C-alpha cells in the first residue's frame, strides 16, 4: 500500500512524497545467529534480528526502496561516494541507492574479516576480502541495473545489503516512519 503526493507546475521540477505501508500480517523478524564469530557475537548487547522487514506496529515500512523507472536524465554523477559500512557484522545501510559511475566507499568498522561480494545482473561482480586491518576499499558500477540487487558477505551468511544502481538520482529509501521524498523530478516524467 502506497500513498503518494505529486506536486509540480509545468515549469518547475516536481517532488514525489509518499508513505510505504505493508498491507497484511507482518512477518516475524528472524533472530540472527552470530555466535560462530566471537567478534560478531560480542558486538551486540542483545539478540540481533534480521532487517529484511523493518516496520512499525502499524505496518509503516522502514528502508523500503522507492525509485522511478524510464527517466531521461542528463545531469552528472554525484562527486560524493555512496558509503557502505560493516558494523557489528551487519551492513549499514541495509538498503541504499547510488548512480552508475558513482564511487562506492566500503568500510570495515569491525575487528574481523569480511568478504564483500556483489551480485549485479548487468555489471561485473566484485568479490574481495577485507581483513580486519583493511578499513576502506573503493568500488563502482559502470552501468545502471534494471532492479535492486544484493551485496553479501561470504564469511557471514546473514550479512546482506540491497542496492539500486540507477542512471538517474530519482530514488529514495523510506525513513523509520515509512516516509520518503524524491525531489527535483523533471516535468513530464
Protein language model features and the residues they cover:
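Bacterial N-terminal signal peptides
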Residues: 1-9
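Extracytoplasmic copper-binding redox domains, predominantly the cupredoxin/blue-copper superfamily
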Residues: 11-189
